[in-house]
Each structure stands twice: as C-alpha cells, then as structure tokens.
C-alpha cells in the first residue's frame, strides 16, 4: 500500500503485479461510494481474478474514502477532481494507458475519465451503473435522514469503520452537482456494462450500452450490493479485457 | 500418505458481523482446491465477500446451501487434507497444519511520502 500526493489530497493506492508477469495494459479499479479498494474489490476477490489473468491491478482509495484524505468541501468532490487524481496517479506511476473497471460511483468516474482522457483509457467496464439519478429525491443537505434509496445507502456506508459521514455527504453533493449525461459518450473507448438483474441503481444500463455501442451483461438474481463479487461479473470483465 | 478431515467454520468477517448469507459456492464436493483459491461467495449486511480456501485439500462436505444464513463460527466446509505418513502425530488429537510456503507478497510496502 503506497500513498502519493495527487493534487490537494494524499491518495492511498495499491499496485499489484500479476502472478505471471505480463506486459498487458494495467487495470485501474474504481470503487463505489462509501467503500474503498479493499472492501469493494479485494474482499470480493478481484485482484486474484485479474492477477490470475495476467493483469496488473492499480487500486486507489478515491478521495474521501478509505486511507485517502477526506476533504469536507463539496467542491473537492466534483467528478473532475477525481479524474485529476487518477491522471495524477497514472503520471506518478508512468503508466500511459489503463483499462478501467468501475462499480457504481466508480463507474460514473470511469465514464468521466474515458471522456476526459480517451488517450489514457483503452477499455472501460462499468459495473452497477445506469443512467438513473442515484440521488433521486434525496435531500443532500441531510443525507441519510430521508427514506430514498440513496438515504439508505448513505446510512449503511456512513456507519462503516474508517468512513467520515461529513466527507461522504460532501462527496454526494459534489457528485450530484454534475448530473450524469449519456451524451456525449466517450469516443474510441469500448464499453462493457455489467449489472445485477435486481440492481435498481443500474436501471437502464442495457439501453445505455446500446446507445453508446457497448455491450451489457446481466448477472441473474443479484442486486446492487451483491453483484460485485459475482463470478459472472469477473468473467465478463476478464473476457472483455483479455479476450 | 493419509488423509485427515478438517472442518473450516465461517470466519469473523469483522465490524461486529455475526452471520453471512451464502451467495454462491465456488467449489463442489469432490473438487481439489488450492490454498487461497476462491471457496465461497457470501454477503453480509455490509458487503459481498469471497472467502479464500484456508487449505489445500479435497472438498468432502459443504455445510450450507446457497441463500442459507450461516452464523460466524458455524461449519462451512469439510476438507480431506493429505498428511504425510511420517509427520509427527503422537499425542496430537487432530492435526497441526504444516505451514506452507508464504504466498509471494503482491503489495508493495512503502511508507507514505507525507
């Protein structure tokens, strides 16, 4: 686990070489809101699945999360601040291009990074993500107080060890300040969408995939919380990145 | 060479969690598994987790069905583990596992630069 200065925040990340050294494009894993690399990806078996396929894994804790700094100012969480961190990380590691694998908010940021710097992104796999507004009807001045799907997510993650509820609230407001738009879509970056069949936060993923020339894989029986560890998801991503 | 049966229980997954739901077995009865290979995918109230195999061995019994809720400490899998015949056994009930070679570290450790 290493940390570096990417702009205004110190970012913690891991850099995991593959089990079989290979010169494949590294994979940058972007976790979801309120989690971190270890919880979203490591515990769910992703480094093993990707490393076993000969892929180097780069796993940051995004700003406001895990072992990275947690500013309290919502402007620090605009999507472009995250993409600047990630480009800073790639520069620091002297990595020209990566494949992206995101989950939930991490997928939204993967889309943003592919839009901002298409020359740095070879392919992007977006898990647990669709064009619906994740913050619909939520009062972001007091996240967790209401009863919307986002309030429920917020209550769960704000209670996790190591999380800072105030930073997460600022993060939600920063993300919500730039509503997702399906147009323009990233150019020249093949996209894969993967989502649980019961994932309401990924509603519309199939249509979004069709609109931007991507493919969509559905994980039977899974919802937003439990699709991330699925073998179907991992296999779809490995096939997409290595196949 | 002989085989001993050893049963692995649902480990403490941290944060005060007392149970987990089995989502999907990654192994079947009769499979030979390597240590650290994916064993079972479980879901807690906090997250979805893949539990790696604690040992190399052959799967003898899976103690929970998919979608079943398992308390921490309850039996999860029984393995038949190969033991060498000349391994010291006298006076030991069960078996002291032989420590295997440490897996190569994949995490680079470097102190924070701040």
Residue ranges of each PLM-predicted region?
Chain A
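Conserved acidic catalytic loop of the alpha/beta-hydrolase fold
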Residues: 80-98
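N-terminal cap/lid segment of alpha/beta-hydrolase-fold proteins
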Residues: 1-11
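Conserved alpha/beta-hydrolase "acid-adjacent" motif
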Residues: 200-206
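Flexible "cap/lid" loop of the alpha/beta hydrolase fold
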Residues: 108-116, 122-149
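Conserved HGGG/HGGXW glycine-rich cap/lid loop of the alpha/beta-hydrolase fold
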Residues: 12-69
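Short beta-strand/loop motif that positions the catalytic acidic residue
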Residues: 187, 193-195
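Catalytic histidine-centered segment of alpha/beta-hydrolase-like enzymes
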Residues: 222-234
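Active-site nucleophile elbow and catalytic-triad environment of alpha/beta-hydrolase enzymes
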Residues: 166-183, 198-200
């Amino acid at each position: 686990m290493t940390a570096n200065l990417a702009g205004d925040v110190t970012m913690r990340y891991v850099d995991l070489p593959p089990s079989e050294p290979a010169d494949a494009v590294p994979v940058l894993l972007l976790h979801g809101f309120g989690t971190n690399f270890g919880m979203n990806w490591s515990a769910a078996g992703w480094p093993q699945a990707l490393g076993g396929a000969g892929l180097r894994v780069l796993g940051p804790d995004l700003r406001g999360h895990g072992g990275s700094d947690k500013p309290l100012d919502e402007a620090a969480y605009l999507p472009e601040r995250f993409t600047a961190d990630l480009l800073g990380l790639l520069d620091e590691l002297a990595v020209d291009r990566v494949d992206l694998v995101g989950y939930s908010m991490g997928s939204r940021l993967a889309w943003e990074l592919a839009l901002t710097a298409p020359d740095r992104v070879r392919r992007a796999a977006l898990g647990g993500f669709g064009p619906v507004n994740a913050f619909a009807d939520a009062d972001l001045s007091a996240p967790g107080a209401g009863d919307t799907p986002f309030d429920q997510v917020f209550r769960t993650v704000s209670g996790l060890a190591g999380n800072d509820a105030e930073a997460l609230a600022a993060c939600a407001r920063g993300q919500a300040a730039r509503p997702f738009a399906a147009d323009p879509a990233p150019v020249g970056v093949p996209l894969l969408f993967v989502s649980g069949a019961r994932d309401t936060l990924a509603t519309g993923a199939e249509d979004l995939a069709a609109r931007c020339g991507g493919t969509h894989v559905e994980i039977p029986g899974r919802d937003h919380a439990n699709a991330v560890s699925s073998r179907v998801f991992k296999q779809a991503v490995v096939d997409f990145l290595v196949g | 060479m002989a085989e001993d049966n050893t049963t692995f229980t649902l480990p403490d997954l941290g944060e005060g969690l007392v149970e987990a739901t089995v989502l999907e077995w990654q192994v079947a009865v009769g499979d030979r598994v390597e240590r650290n290979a994916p064993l079972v995918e479980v879901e807690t109230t906090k997250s979805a987790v893949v539990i790696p195999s604690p040992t190399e061995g052959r799967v003898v019994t899976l103690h929970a069905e998919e979608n079943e809720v398992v308390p921490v400490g309850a039996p999860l899998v029984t393995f038949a583990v190969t033991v060498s015949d000349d391994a010291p056994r006298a006076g030991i009930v069960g078996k002291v596992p032989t420590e295997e070679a440490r897996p190569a570290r994949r995490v680079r450790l470097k102190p924070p630069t701040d």
